[in-house]
Amino acid sequence: MFCIQCEQTIQTPTVKGCSFAQGMCGKTSEVSDLQDVLVHSLQGVSFWASLGRACDVIDTEVDEWAPKAFFATLTNVNFDPARIIEFAQQSHEFKQRLEQKVRAAATLIGFEIPELSAAAQFDLPTDSSELLALAPQAAVNRGHDSQHEDVIGLRLLCLYGLKGAAAYMEHARVLGQTDDAIFAEYHEIMAFLGTDPSDLKQLLDTSMQIGLMNYKVMEMLDKGETDTFGHPQPTTVNVKTKKGHCILVSGHDLHDLEKILQQTEGKGINVYTNGEMLPAHGYPELNKYPHLAGNYGSAWQNQQKEFANFPGAIVMTSNCLLNPDVGSYADRLFTRSIVGWPGVDHLEGDDFSAVIDCALAQEGFKHDEIEQMITVGFGRNALMEAAPAVVEQVKEGNIKHFFLVGGCDGDKSERSYYTDFTAQAPEDSVILTLACGKFRFNKNQFGDINGIPRLLDVGQCNDAYSAIQLAIALSQEFDCGINELPLTLVLSWFEQKAIVILLTLFALGVKGIYTGPTAPAFLTENLLKIMQDEFDMRSISTPEQDLKTILAA
């Protein structure tokens, strides 16, 4: 086992990365090795899918499936070895199918097949018990004994960035949004990484290519969400519970939430969001359901306690999943799509009757709690509508600075930085927030500036697209570049979606971003220096010192 993709990976003066019987996330060495085999096999799939486009061979089924399978290897998504084996076996079947199609088409048009990469020749045995023996060939740090650590680090930056983009591609696909040009670019990059490249400049350029591709993917996902559910509107959400039977929906998949709301109408079941599903309340086509009762709990790292105390059924639609056996709620948990845990019921299709039956069999909440409201729904359209008023307040000197404080949450004590930072931000500043990092401070009171709330919840992690649109609009209004705006990004990272959003911001030319709580373990000192020199990336220190530096600029 070797895994170094998330923030909680082992980091000591002598060891970087999880390489023992179990990772810090709870992933076993077996699952980790199987995921490596799957990823390397997917690189082979992309070799033939990319080559196929030169021969007019496009397999839509493969295009739509491959990013989904890649998503299954993202942090805290799928811990079930049987499911990973299924993905791996399917990838091998697709690779063989594509190879046959491409070779046949190449013969017809006289196209010469280039030299095959190792990934293109990576064949899986029919006996699944033999898959683990291939793990050394597929390890994400393969070649580390002969390659410079900077090369390995950049390969991983690209791999993890592309993995984050693949997750957003799958979220968009579920909502009917696909683009052949993006599929082609995804396969091109994935196939390139399967060649084990060693040119530093080429790898750096590829990381920027991934960032720009992800910008288009986030735009696509934004369209899918707003076309399907309407544009988010500022909406108050109750973060306390109501008496009655209940279902909790966690993850990111708004499609699943809608289906659950439709199927629970009139059944006396309250539906609650959790974690990154909180922004769902801002969408008119979801908020119209009166039994969408509120948001329960906070960020992912608290779920074992919060889920254990939830007296109903729980549906995990995407990341982040933790071991449900710790809180003894595995019998009330259902996984969807790419999510998996051994022994937990997995649902395919759109029939949630098993979830409903489970919810009705539980006692539910016994009484109503006193309501506590927070506001969400400041998505792209709402921000654009508010832009003229915001500009006016800036011109009048009432708003002097904007902070975007968000990203992934986690359980390290250093993450209290983000709570303290927002609390100490000047009262003439506006704070935009997104992703689950918001739970560090979104129940605090920030007041308003002449009717403009000082805290604006933009949405899920992918809604960084909305924040970017606001920054572009403000830069146009003030006739300056984004980096000249009184705007500072203070981001927290945990997994691969955060990595690709950072690459997107870099690719768009955004500089001076503060990141934390720690640097990714796969980035060497040399690579961190490159990011500091090229993009003015800064590591967080203390809220007091960072605010002093920011406001003095």
Swiss-Prot record:
Top EC group: oxidoreductase
Reaction(s) this enzyme catalyzes, per UniProt: A + NH4(+) + H2O = hydroxylamine + AH2 + H(+)
Cofactor: binding comment: Binds 1 [2Fe-2S] cluster.
Enzyme Commission number(s): 1.7.99.1
Chain positions found as Cysteine persulfide: C408
Cofactor(s) listed: [2Fe-2S] cluster; hybrid [4Fe-2O-2S] cluster
Keywords: 2Fe-2S, Cytoplasm, Iron, Iron-sulfur, Metal-binding, Oxidoreductase
This protein's name: Hydroxylamine reductase
Organism: Vibrio atlanticus (strain LGP32) (Vibrio splendidus (strain Mel32))
Species lineage: Bacteria, Pseudomonadati, Pseudomonadota, Gammaproteobacteria, Vibrionales
